[in-house]
Amino acid sequence: MIDELLAADVLVFGIPMYNFSVPAVFKAYIDQIARVGRTFTSSYEGLVKGKKAFVVTARGGGGYGPGEPRETVNFEDPYVKSVLGFIGITDVTFLHINNTARGEEVQASLNQVRTQIKEAASVS
């Protein structure tokens, strides 16, 4: 897994929000790639440099962003940003698909994310 990570120029992670955080399978992936001497040094310097990461999240509700009502229970974004930063990936863009459990409301969120993806693709 580490070799695949190191070989990639761009990383795309699809992560649903489970109980305000990441699913166990994503945590297990992080546990496999966070290795001293491979992705960080013994003095805790990240070794995975020069990579761009896109993190696409799916959430049943909304309001988890800065200044929103459920910001304080969003443990997903800070965790992902911190752990990727720890191994040296600091160029991270989050794309949030919100309200997946709310029928028609999800469409607006999907449209917003599609626009963000198109904008990101035109910059790259």
Region locations from a protein language model:
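Glycine-rich phosphate/pyrophosphate-binding loop and the adjoining helix
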Residues: P66-S124
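Helix-loop-strand module that forms the ligand-binding subsite of alpha/beta enzymes
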Residues: I2-V73, P78
